[in-house]
């Protein structure tokens, strides 16, 4: 989404922003990264979708990109990865996840549970648009954003593992012969 990419680039000008099909990009580029964060589209997994289908009577399959990414990274990625999504309306068939707030996070490293604000969605919205008459102007992309404290927590867990791994690799390289 060009609009989301432009806003991200505005907020984080030192980051490299790639506008592409993230699912396809991941498949061909995952080996290039020490840490991968994925957040595939969630509307078809959401508990809200379950009720929407019951009301509108329009059946919709869950988007399997979520499971494709988890399975693929779990089998082939040597780096660290975390895939975030909403709590689904069904029982996940891959139960190795961490539940934090309104999120399930599948990963290949430990992510300790932290307390999230009870009204996490409202808290996030107030952070970006405040309260009052303009709060309803919140875009879907902003509403779907992961709480920044949760994102930082997951990143810190990954960075800690990367630093430990790199320190260990460094010691094993020079430790035996010196």
Where on the chain are the PLM-derived regions?
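Conserved active-site and SAM-binding loop architecture
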Residues: 1-178
